[in-house]
Structure formats: structure tokens, C-alpha cells
Amino acid sequence: MEDDIWKAVDLSGVFDEDSVELRPRLTSVSSPSLSSTPPPSPLSSPSWSEEELPAPRSDGSPASSISAHKSYPKIFQTFKKDLSEVTVDRLMYPSFYERVQISIQTEDQSWLQRISARKRIKRIPSIEITEAPQENLASKLRENWVINPEEPKLSILCEMEFNEDFVNFFETSLRTLPSIGPPTILSYRKEYSCMDVILKDEQELGATCEFCGSDLQSLFFNMDTSLDDAGTKGKSHRSCCLQFQNLLDYITEERLTTKSPEMELISISPHAAHGSDADRLKAKEKAMQRKQERQMARHFTIIPEQSPVGTEEDTKHLKTISYQLSGDYLQNVRTEEVDLQITNISITCCDSWKICGKVMGNELLEKDYKHGSKFLTSFPDGTIQIFYPSGNLAIIRVPNKTDGFICIIQEDTATSPAILALFDSSGRSSCYHPNGNVWVYINILGGQYSDQAGNRIRTWNWSSTKPTPAFVSFKPVLLALNRYIGIRILEQDKVSIHFLAMGQQATICLGTKVVLQDPEEVPTLRFLSGDDLLLLASLIKIRRLFSKMEGCVNFPVSKAWERLKQPSYLSSLSLKLLALCQNSGIQQNIMETITELIKENE
């Protein structure tokens, strides 16, 4: 029964007649479970299967029943595609033709493995060897980067059962792969041993003279190049030519000049004392005498220049000159200002500070802005620090050496801030313009106000220093140093600094009360210098000369212009200038010069 089934299957193309062991075991041929799929319909059956089906037998053998129930594997049923137009090469794909049913073949795995091994041997395609055209290096590199689908390896993958599905799903991805396998850096490279390499021995070339070309080996063999023999004169056989002899002489001279001198070793063994005992005693007495002379010179004063100079005979007897550098230094003669020359002055400091209208004492206190940065810090010694909203230091007040405080105001700059104002409790203060010129300057006697160019606009004296009440009362000075700091000078004892930023306010008062016992000794207009008064006198003289020139132009023939007097305004200016000279307290010689300039008879 089993032999008849194999004859009906007709696998003579694959199995030999003697290979009975390769046939799988058939447990149940007529079992309905072996036909896993229903018979294909005539619409879906491929054309090539109809041509190769064997003719059914009339005797009703079991082979006819098996062929009637033949079916395709399940994988062919998933692809609902018409295969009528597919042409298959029988020689290349013999596995596509009718064979044993899949249900019978898959029963024994060992049988399938042996069959697949034989198929692999038969399906190896022949590779045609063709001469490759000559290509450059760039084309070879591009071939490694891109996979050519026409290569034999890729064609083997494409010639499969599902050609169209392979092309749709796998061909594009294979073309994008840069390479197949591990990176080239990991590839095996055979290391060649250097056992077969024959190394040649180095050959010493003979030394030849570069000047004449003669052999120098015998010359160096007979010549001694040590330093001991370098000073001796060269013999005739030592040089082959004059140029080479000059070179040897130059090298010898250089070696002698660069040769380090020999070290002389001294004896460190104990030796007897130099000189006799009497000589050592005399040396000690001389040392003691010089020491006493230096001590006496410290107590004596310097000999004045008027002292008589000794004669030459006296100088000859002097054997030892002893001197010592003086420890005195020149003291700088400090020119006292006019303010300090005034006697009987009583100065009282009026220092205080407030926060939001509340008077504060010398205590440790810290306050911050709303955004968290520090606003004010005060210490028990009276030091106060006020900061801008940016965090830069705005005002600092520190104790003075004698009494009171010193207050410094800086601009809102992180690096190298300029000083805007400087106040002192002793009565001296100054404020500056943004360009650095003095804006306001005050002292214990008065003050002056200048513009941005440095020109003095007005001056004043404090009420406590006025000798008579004839002067105009002082007008308050209000300054705004920047958008946060303002200065108010209402009186000598009412000088205040106001700081206002982001709702925080602080006020520092630095007033001074000065009481003079004799106000008459203070000049009324002490701010006017002699140079200013000389300029005013020269101005009056120039205007008077212009007035005379105008008279000459108006009366060129007549001499009536000689009888004309100077304008009345020049006369009044002259009187005012003389009054200024008397009130400013200038020197007498300057007063006489001004009087000569404003004379009317010139």
C-alpha cells in the first residue's frame, strides 16, 4: 500500500529508488485530519498546477484518492492573488511542483532537514566572472556605501517564492544599509611576522674633508683632541689643508675661552691666630674708641655753617673719619589757612539723622527695600551706610578724628564711583557738578555758589560772622545731586542730606554753630582774591580808553575831547572797586597797583 502511494506521488526526480530511508513514516493515509485545507477551487488554483497534475487512474486506487484531495500550504492561502500570469522556471524552482502533501512531510523533522540540505546543494547559482572596468578610488568608495540590487547576493534573495512581497517590504531597506556585517575596524587583519625581514648592518662611512675631500680617519687617529694638548701648536701632519687647520685653531680657542677655571680648595684645618696678642689688643681698643665716638655724636648738635674751617695741617692729622646718617627728616611746613588763624572761635556740631521723620540714635539697625535689597545699616559708633536700590553705596557717614562726622556721597555706579559731595561737621563742605567742577563750597565763615563752567555766581557770609547787619540776608541753597539725593543749605547750622527711594526715606543733618568773639577781624569779602580785583581794575581802564577813542573819532580836529571826563558809570565802578579792596583785606601793594590803574588822569 505504501509503495503504491509513493509511485502515485512520483518523486523520482528527488529521491532515488534505493533511498528508502528518506521516506517519511505514513501513519494514517486515509485520515481526514491529514487534509488540512479544502480542495482549491478552479478559480483560485494556479495554471501551472493544472498542467502538471497526473491523470487519474480508473482502477480506483488509493493514489487517485490522495491526488483528488491535494491541497496547497496555508501560507499560499493568505495571499489572495492571481498567480495565472506567473511563469516559473522548472529547472530553477523544482520545489514549486506537485509533491507530497505538507501534512505528510512535516511529520518527521529529520526527513525535512535532509531534503533541505540537498536543495541547497542544487540551488547554488553559477557566478560569472567578468572583467571589471578600471575605476577610481571615489567610485569604489561609493560602491561600499550603496548596495546595488543587481549584485548576485541580492539577486539570490530576490529570487524567492514571494518576489513581489519581498520587493515591496525589504528591497528599499536593504538599499539604505551602509554595509552588512561588523564594522571594518573590527575586521581581522593578519599580522605579518618580521622574521623574514633581513636587517642590514650600519656601515660607517669614512670621514672626508669638506674643503679638499681627503680622508680624515688617519688624521683624527694621530691627533689628540683633549684640553690638555689644546694649547700646543698643531704640527704639520695634523691638517690636510689650510681651511681645515683654521677650523681646528678656531675650535681650540673657543674651548680655551669657555673652559671653567679650576677650583682652589682651601684648608679647613685649625690654624694659629693671625698677628700677635698686642696687635689684637690694639684692634679691640680702636673698635671701642669708634663706638664711643658714635655715641657722643648722637648727643651733640650739628656744627653750624659759620664755624671756622680747620687748616690743612689739622686735616692731615685726622686719620679716621667717623660719621653717622642723621635720623631727622624735613618737616613739611603747613600753611595755616585764614580760618585757623582766627582766634577765639567756638564750634558746635549739630549732627543727627532721621528715618521716615523719626529721630534715631547711634544703634545697630538694618532696613531693606521692598524687593529685598539692603537700604540702610547703622552701627553703635555712629557709622551709617545708605544704599541705592541697585545695591551700590550711596551715602556713608563715619566718625571724625576729633569731633563729629564726615559724610561722603557717591554716584550710582558699581565700579569707580565719582564723589558727588563731601560734608564735615566742622563746617567745611563741598558739592560737585557732574563734570567735576565745584558747585557749592562752604566753610565756617561763608560760602560761594558756582555754575557748571566754574564761574562764581554768588558768595555769602554766615550771619554769625557778619560784623554789621548791613548785608543782605542769606538765601537758601537747594541742590539735587541725582534722582535720589537732595541737599538743603538753609543756614550754617541747618545743612541736611535727604535720600528718598522706593518709599524709603532718610535724612542726615550736619550743621555747625560758630561763634566769633571779635567778628571785626574777619574780612567781609574774603572770597575775593587779589587777581580778581586786578582784573576788575584792568576792565575799568580799558573801558576808559575806549571812551577816549570814541571822542577822538567824533572830534578829529578839535581838542575838545581832552576836556571830556570819563563816563559816570566808570566812576561808580571805580568807587565800588575801592570799597571791595578795603573789605576783602588784600595786601597793601596790590591795593596800590589797583589805585594806579583806575586813575582818571591817564
Curated annotation (Swiss-Prot):
GO terms for cellular component: nucleus. PANTHER family: GLUTAMATE-RICH PROTEIN 6 (PTHR23093:SF11), SIMILAR TO CHROMOSOME 3 OPEN READING FRAME 20 (PTHR23093). This is Glutamate-rich protein 6. Belongs to the ERICH6 family. The keyword Lipoprotein does not apply. InterPro entries: FAM194_C (IPR029281). Residues 25-36 have a biased composition (Low complexity). Residues 22-67 are annotated as: Disordered. It comes from Rattus norvegicus (Rat). Keywords: Nucleus. The keyword Nucleus applies. It is found in: Nucleus.
